[in-house]
Amino acid sequence: MQWTEVSVMTTNEAVEAVSNILQEAGASGVKIDDAADYANLKPGKYGEIVDLDSIPHRTSGAEISAYYPETIFVPEILPTIRQRVQELTQFGLDPTPGTVTTKAVDDESWATAWQKYYHPVRVTRYLTVTPSWEKYTPVQPNEHVIRLDPGMAFGTGTHPTTRLSMTALEMVVRGGETMYDVGTGSGVLSIAAKYLGVNQITAFDLDEVAVRSAKTNLDLNPIATDVVAKPNDLLKGIHHPVDLVVANILAEIILPLVPQAWENLTPGGYFLTSGIIADKLAEVVAAQEKQGFVIDNILQMKDWRGVIAHRPTEDE
C-alpha cells in the first residue's frame, strides 16, 4: 500500500499543536523529529542516556511527518493544513518556517522509520521513559521505568510540557490519591502517577485513537493496568470529586476546564496544568484564581509553563 508523507518544518514549541493539526486532517500516524529531544539525551545530572553521536539527529527546530493512506486525497487537505499551521500565531505559538512538503512512501518504510528516534530518557528525578522494544535496567535507586509503545503516532515523554507535568506530580503526590488525567494522549502521566503512588486513576481523551493508544501503553506497565481510559470531552458530565486533576493541554483548552476541575476536586485537592506557553500564563493563572484556586507554584522549562494549584479547604 502506498502512503503520502506530509512533513511540516516548525519550532520546538509548536510540535504538539502541529501534530494535532495533522492528525485531525486524517493522518494514520505521526512521526516527530524534535531537536529538543536530542538535547535531552546529552549527559546531564542523571548521567549519559545515549551516545548522541551514534544516531542521526536534528540540531534545531522540529519536523513532524504525518502519513495518509491512498483513500485520502492529500492535495485537497493541504491548503487547510497550511492555513491552520500559520494560524498558530493566534494562540501564541511560533510555527516558523511552517513549510509543508509531501512525498510518497510504501507501507514498510513508514511503519518502522520512527523507531530510530526513540531511546530511553531520564525525564525527572524518579522517572525514565523507554520504548517497549528496548531493554533498559534502572541505574539508580527509586528509578521507575515507564515503557511506551508509541506506534506511529507518539511523543517521547521528553517534551517540556510532559516533563513539567511529571515534575509537578513528583512534588505533590504523597500516595493513595485518586486522580483524573485529562487529555491523556499516550497515557504517560497516568503511568507516572501510578509509579509515584496514586491509587485510582481515570484517564480521559476526546480522541478515541488516543484512548486506544493509552490503553496499549497502560497494558505495558503492570502497575497501571487498573487505570481506566475512556473517551470524554474534558470533564463534561463527570461529577465525582478526586484528589488530583492533571491536564497537559494547550492553554486555550485549560480555560474551559478550570470550572470543571473545581467541581471535581475535593477540598485541598491539586489541579496540575501544563502545555502553557509563556505568553498565556497570566491568562491561565487569572482564570484559576478567579475560580477560587490557590496558586502554589509555577514551573518553567524553555518557553513552557506548568501551574500547581489547589482547591482550598474551609480552614484556608
Swiss-Prot record:
**Catalytic activity of the protein:** L-lysyl-[protein] + 3 S-adenosyl-L-methionine = N(6),N(6),N(6)-trimethyl-L-lysyl-[protein] + 3 S-adenosyl-L-homocysteine + 3 H(+)
GO cellular component terms attached to this protein's record: cytoplasm
Q: Which UniProt keywords apply?
A: Cytoplasm, Methyltransferase, S-adenosyl-L-methionine, Transferase
Q: Which Pfam families match?
A: PrmA
What InterPro entries does the record point to?
Ribosomal_L11_MeTrfase_PrmA, Ribosomal_PrmA_MeTrfase, SAM-dependent_MTases_sf
Give EC number(s), comma-separated: 2.1.1.-
Domain of life from the UniProt record: Bacteria
Q: Where in the cell is it found?
A: Cytoplasm
> Some GO term, biological process aspect, for this entry: which one?
methylation
What are the binding positions for S-adenosyl-L-methionine in this chain?
T162, G183, D205, N248
GO MF: protein-lysine N-methyltransferase activity
Transmembrane regions listed in the UniProt entry = none
Just give the chief location class.
cytoplasm
What the protein does comes down to: Methylates ribosomal protein L11.
| Protein family according to the UniProt entry | Belongs to the methyltransferase superfamily. PrmA family.
Q: Which NCBIfam families match?
A: prmA
Q: What is this protein called?
A: Ribosomal protein L11 methyltransferase
Q: Which organism is it from?
A: Levilactobacillus brevis (strain ATCC 367 / BCRC 12310 / CIP 105137 / JCM 1170 / LMG 11437 / NCIMB 947 / NCTC 947)
Lineage start: Bacteria, Bacillati, Bacillota, Bacilli, Lactobacillales
Which gene is this protein's source?
Answer: prmA
